[in-house]
Amino acid sequence: MIRKERAILALEDGTVYRGYAFGYRGETVGEVVFNTSMTGYQEIMTDPSYNGQIVTITYPHVGNYGVAIYDMESNKPYVRGFISREFSGEYSNYRAQQSLEAFMQQYGVVSIQGIDTRALVRRLRSGGVVKGVIAHRSFTHPEDPYGEFTPAEEQIYVQRARDHQDIDGFDMTKEVTTALPYAFPTLRQGKRVVLMDFGIKHTIIERLAEVGIEPIVVPAHTTPAQIMALQPHGLFLSNGPGDPAPLEYAHKTAWEMMGLLPTFGICLGHQILGLAAGGQTFKMKFGHRGGNQPVKNLLTGNVEITSQNHGYAVDLDSIPNGAFVATHVNLNDGTLEGMAHSRYPVFSVQYHPEASPGPHDSRYLFDRFIEEIDAFDGGNGTPIIKANPGRLGV
């Protein structure tokens, strides 16, 4: 019988799950969330939006197609930890360069397997996300990695989870944004668009380039004057991690830029636009994370299956003067998934139309963005709802 190194997942509510070590041997702490995608573990791990979080994959078997460098969404993993019912030690994929465990060991991703992930997800779904610690026995007891943690040791990790800082009210984009502006290379000349990087995924940049945009990625703290100095045709507000409320510098920039350029926001960028317009955001019980979220396009009546990753949402009713109108809603819980400004060429969605991983139902939004740029009349932007409701449809 093969002996496995012991590990535990200790939650701040006092629950302890006992399993086996995988990946980098050590300890980690973060907010425990779950993702319902059946594939795409590499894209999930390297998505900067997961900064500060320990991700539970609901699909029971993870890692059997290894890791391919071309599928990374950033230059390294940003997850604090990874949880699966079972990780595969072997892989079969002609595109892959290494196994999932080797990748985790290379980048310091502490993981646990062998726990009842169904029970964990039910707990998160009913009680909401919690802080947790993954601890490997070999890290604290290298002389006996196969032994059990004592009840007293488990309680130490429970307390460590409780003491960990909440992500609420904390600016996490400073840990993931680019330090310097850079231009993304394209094969053809197109419309220059400034991409505010709050934790942008590589695939989003690639999708924008595919529709004829020349992306210039800038740091999250970039000012309106610095943006306009680049002489762009449009502005894009990216995805990113954590609570949008403390990003007051971004709210200010989005507010001052509103109406000056056609603007498209995704995920955190969507939330920033809502806050910039005077609205409020709220933390969801367990968020939306996965590739199977149904969203209704209110302009066409069509239903899209979308890829999502967010723990906060915009309260549309809190935005004063009807500045934004709803364009998309989630069919599971009715939360806002998309909105458009009633006067300016500014629109946003809460989900990920680039879908990496996930379905491609919403990629038309990138085409609509370039259409808004082409139609923009130099500052008196045509209303994207009243003038032509179909322009955000399929």
Curated annotation (Swiss-Prot):
Annotated positions binding L-glutamine: S49, G240, G242, L268, Q271, N309, G311, Y312
Pfam families tied to this protein: CPSase_sm_chain, GATase
EC class: ligase
Organismal lineage: Bacteria, Thermotogati, Deinococcota, Deinococci, Deinococcales
Name this polypeptide is given: Carbamoyl phosphate synthase small chain
GO cellular component: carbamoyl-phosphate synthase complex; cytoplasm
Pathway recorded for this protein: Amino-acid biosynthesis; L-arginine biosynthesis; carbamoyl phosphate from bicarbonate: step 1/1; Pyrimidine metabolism; UMP biosynthesis via de novo pathway; (S)-dihydroorotate from bicarbonate: step 1/3
UniProt gene name: carA
GO MF annotations, alphabetized: ATP binding; carbamoyl-phosphate synthase (glutamine-hydrolyzing) activity; glutaminase activity
EC number: 6.3.5.5
